[in-house]
C-alpha cells in the first residue's frame, strides 16, 4: 500500500491510496473459491460448480465487494498510521479497476481541529444574586388563581380588556373577501394581542348582540404578501361577552394542589416557595453556564468540521419538527436557517470536550443523582420518573453528559472573573424567558 495525504482546505484532507494488484487478485481468487464451495447452479451438485462459471456469474460482484472492503480497510489503516483524528463520514472516490494492475483510489475527509485552550482567565461571568421574597410568592399565588379562574357571561356590560368574547367576523379589502378573513364563533381573550393591531381595541366598548364594522391596516411585516400594508374592513357580530372570576384562596382552592389533606394556606405558600426556589436555582445555574460557554467560545474561536455542522443541522431540523405541528414546513426550511446555531453547538462540544479531557474529568455520581431528582420533581410521581430514567440508557446518557458538562463548567469558573449582580426574582425570570424565547 502506498499513501499520500494532503490538506485541501482548512480541516479538509484527501488521501490517495494505491493497493497492490497481487493482494487484490489473491483476495478475489480466494473469494471465488469460497463462493464455489456453497454455490448452486442448475446441472451441478452443490459445491461442484466449475470455477470459470462462478467467475462468469459472480465475478463482477465479488470484485466490487473486495474493492469496497479493501478501500475501507486500508483507509482505516491510513488513519491510524498517519495519526489522523477523523471527523464525520469520509467520501470514497473509487478509481478504475484494471485486472493485474495496481488500484488507486482517493478518500476525501475532514479531521478535528487541534484545540489549544487559551485565555481561560479572561472568561467573564455575571452571577445573578436573586432573593425570593413574600411579594414573589404573592404574585405566584395570583398567577395560580388566574389559572383556576372561571368565566361568567355578562349580557348587559360592554366588552373590556381581559374579557373573553365570542364573535363572527368577515374581513374584506377593497370590498373583496380574503383568504382566512372569515370565521364563526371565534373565541378570543381581549388584551392578549393575538390579532392585528387595533382589532381587539375595536371590540372594546361594544355589547353583546351588536353588529359593527372596524377599519384596520395590516402591518407592513404581515406574513401574507397580498395583505401587507392594506386597509381592511371587518364586519363583526359580537355574540357573547364573559368576565373572569378568580377563586378565593381557601380550603377548596388548596385542594387543587398536590398537598396533604387539611393543609393550610401557609403550607401552600411553603410549597410554592420550594418550587420557585428549585426553578430559580436551575435558572441561575443555566445563566452562569450560558455566560461561561459564550465567553469560552469568544476567546477560543476556531474552524470546525463542515461535516459535523451538517450533522448538527440535521439534528436541529429533526428536533424542531418534533416540537411543531407544521413538520412539513420545517423540513423544507433551507439548511442555512439552522447553520449558525449548528456551528455554535459543534464548537461548544469540541471546547468542552477538550476541557474534560485536559482535566481528566469523570462523572460525579452525586451530580447525576441531583440532576435526576431535579427532573423528577417536576413530575407527579418523582420516584417513578427516576426509575423510568434509570431504565432508559439513552436518557441516562444525556444525564451523564449534563453532569460531565457541569464538571467542566466548574473547572472554568475557578479561573473566571465573576462579578455579582443583585436582581429581583421577577426581572431575572423575565430575562430567562426572553432568552429562551429568542433561542427557540
UniProtKB/Swiss-Prot annotation:
<feature type="domain" description="PPIase FKBP-type">
    <location>
        <begin position="162"/>
        <end position="247"/>
    </location>
</feature>
<comment type="function">
    <text>Involved in protein export. Acts as a chaperone by maintaining the newly synthesized protein in an open conformation. Functions as a peptidyl-prolyl cis-trans isomerase.</text>
</comment>
<keyword id="KW-0143">Chaperone</keyword>
<dbReference type="InterPro" id="IPR008880">
    <property type="entry name" value="Trigger_fac_C"/>
</dbReference>
<dbReference type="Pfam" id="PF05698">
    <property type="entry name" value="Trigger_C"/>
</dbReference>
<dbReference type="GO" id="GO:0061077">
    <property type="term" value="P:chaperone-mediated protein folding"/>
</dbReference>
<dbReference type="GO" id="GO:0051301">
    <property type="term" value="P:cell division"/>
</dbReference>
<dbReference type="Pfam" id="PF05697">
    <property type="entry name" value="Trigger_N"/>
</dbReference>
<dbReference type="GO" id="GO:0043335">
    <property type="term" value="P:protein unfolding"/>
</dbReference>
<protein>
    <recommendedName>
        <fullName>Trigger factor</fullName>
        <ecNumber>5.2.1.8</ecNumber>
    </recommendedName>
</protein>
<keyword id="KW-0697">Rotamase</keyword>
<dbReference type="GO" id="GO:0005737">
    <property type="term" value="C:cytoplasm"/>
</dbReference>
<dbReference type="GO" id="GO:0051083">
    <property type="term" value="P:'de novo' cotranslational protein folding"/>
</dbReference>
<dbReference type="InterPro" id="IPR001179">
    <property type="entry name" value="PPIase_FKBP_dom"/>
</dbReference>
<keyword id="KW-0413">Isomerase</keyword>
<dbReference type="GO" id="GO:0044183">
    <property type="term" value="F:protein folding chaperone"/>
</dbReference>
<dbReference type="Pfam" id="PF00254">
    <property type="entry name" value="FKBP_C"/>
</dbReference>
<dbReference type="InterPro" id="IPR037041">
    <property type="entry name" value="Trigger_fac_C_sf"/>
</dbReference>
<dbReference type="GO" id="GO:0003755">
    <property type="term" value="F:peptidyl-prolyl cis-trans isomerase activity"/>
</dbReference>
<dbReference type="GO" id="GO:0015031">
    <property type="term" value="P:protein transport"/>
</dbReference>
<keyword id="KW-0132">Cell division</keyword>
<keyword id="KW-0131">Cell cycle</keyword>
<dbReference type="InterPro" id="IPR027304">
    <property type="entry name" value="Trigger_fact/SurA_dom_sf"/>
</dbReference>
<keyword id="KW-0963">Cytoplasm</keyword>
<dbReference type="GO" id="GO:0043022">
    <property type="term" value="F:ribosome binding"/>
</dbReference>
<comment type="similarity">
    <text>Belongs to the FKBP-type PPIase family. Tig subfamily.</text>
</comment>
<dbReference type="InterPro" id="IPR005215">
    <property type="entry name" value="Trig_fac"/>
</dbReference>
<dbReference type="InterPro" id="IPR046357">
    <property type="entry name" value="PPIase_dom_sf"/>
</dbReference>
<dbReference type="InterPro" id="IPR036611">
    <property type="entry name" value="Trigger_fac_ribosome-bd_sf"/>
</dbReference>
<dbReference type="InterPro" id="IPR008881">
    <property type="entry name" value="Trigger_fac_ribosome-bd_bac"/>
</dbReference>
